[in-house]
């Protein structure tokens, strides 16, 4: 199992939570970005810098992630792709992506994008806060526990 992070827009605090979980559980982490990242922990944590361009990092993650992997991303189209492959996805606010909700979230994203482009809605998601951080840490712990238990059964 590998934890993939769509790193360009992922909050630093979320990366730190994942790094701690990686160390505790001895799980590899792969950060994917289209620009060089700040130095990070060594050992289980690696990074890859992909070419600049829209969706290049997403394409890389979608191609490389397997059904046994966890992907951390706020990008709903990427989430839909990895869920279709059988991988697990979580957004930085701790919301789990699954077959039941990813289609609805993709439709809502497209609707909001359309409304914003027409000037009917302004702004984006609420500012990232302490509650989001706690929700993410809790979700990450639950998901990793479940995935590791399932991996042991196989």
From Swiss-Prot:
It comes from the Bacteria. InterPro entries: UPF0178 (IPR003791). NCBIfam families: PRK00124.1 (NF001095). Belongs to the UPF0178 family. This is UPF0178 protein Glov_0658. It comes from Trichlorobacter lovleyi (strain ATCC BAA-1151 / DSM 17278 / SZ). The lineage of its organism: Bacteria, Pseudomonadati, Thermodesulfobacteriota, Desulfuromonadia, Geobacterales.
């Amino acid at each position: 199992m590998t934890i993939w992070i769509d790193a360009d827009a992922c909050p630093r605090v979320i990366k730190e939570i994942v790094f701690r979980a990686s160390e505790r559980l001895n799980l590899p982490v792969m950060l994917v970005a289209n620009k060089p990242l700040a130095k990070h922990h060594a050992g289980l944590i690696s990074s890859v810098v992909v070419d600049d361009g829209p969706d290049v990092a997403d394409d890389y993650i979608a191609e490389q992630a397997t059904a046994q992997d966890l992907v951390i991303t706020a990008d709903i189209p990427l989430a839909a792709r990895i869920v279709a492959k059988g991988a697990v996805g979580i957004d930085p606010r701790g919301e789990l992506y699954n077959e039941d909700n990813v289609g609805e979230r993709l439709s809502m994203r497209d609707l909001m994008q359309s409304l914003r482009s027409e000037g009917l809605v302004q702004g984006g998601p609420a500012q990232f806060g302490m509650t989001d951080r706690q929700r993410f840490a809790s979700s990450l712990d639950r998901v990793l526990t479940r995935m590791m238990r399932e991996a042991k059964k196989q």
